[in-house]
């Protein structure tokens, strides 16, 4: 009579062998970990600390860049223009954010053929604070002016971010293009400081919808600004992925072949004026100008003598050349004002 085949014996022996091997491996691994921590624990701890600080700084970058609450009432009160035709409009971005716009209407001679300026402001306050500047644009340039509050600013919803601001600019341009009472061939972008980066990016993505661009006291990029403001720390060696907000205007300006005006206040104590000159030099536009105001500060260059004369000359001469730019051969002359 055959003996019954028993599986348990070999299986038990196999399990015991595996357990014994695993225990030995665990002891060796534990010893290796102890030795590694003893030898390199300081480096590991330093790495963890640096990683934590990097994460905090990455999240903290928005606080250093966006100031929608300055002045303190900026999120509660948006001054409206008085005594002039205007519309207070709300639009939606593609990601569903509700934005607040002010449209200042030019009602002088031939209003249907007037240019329309899309005004992108800096990193603080709201569109109401820019109304006095925008009214002077309307009067001197005989143009409609559309001011938009980015997400998280003024009465607009959401929180500011680089991609969010780009979407806000696109939504504003889309809205203007839907209006039958606006000449779609004469849409001009204007941006000051951070708004200059937004305007340059919008122009680079919409070369056939933007007739011209004007930027004032803006920067090459946020990494360039970080290297300038924090010169005591080797910020220039940080890779781009360390920056949550980049605003790489020195790259975005390269596709912008439409007529371009670069406005630089040489008394700007925040953004080095040399950055405006570098953006001007990077621009491939055959019809570009660099308007220089020696007494112009970061926020108040528009109050300098001759400021609106420079803008008016640009609007009259260079905007007309936009229609011929596709067929004109050679390089147009460049004027430095």
UniProtKB/Swiss-Prot annotation:
The active site is at 193 (charge relay system), 268 (charge relay system), 298 (charge relay system). Glycans are attached at residue 299. One of its GO terms (cellular component) is membrane. The chain crosses the membrane at residues 30-50. Disulfide bonds: none annotated. The keyword Transmembrane applies. Pfam families: Abhydrolase_1. It comes from the Eukaryota. GO terms for molecular function: palmitoyl-(protein) hydrolase activity. It is a single-pass type II membrane protein. Coiled coil: none annotated. Keywords: Glycoprotein, Hydrolase, Membrane, Signal-anchor, Transmembrane, Transmembrane helix. Its EC number is 3.-.-.-. Belongs to the serine esterase family. This is Protein ABHD13. The lineage of its organism: Eukaryota, Metazoa, Chordata, Craniata, Vertebrata. The gene is abhd13.
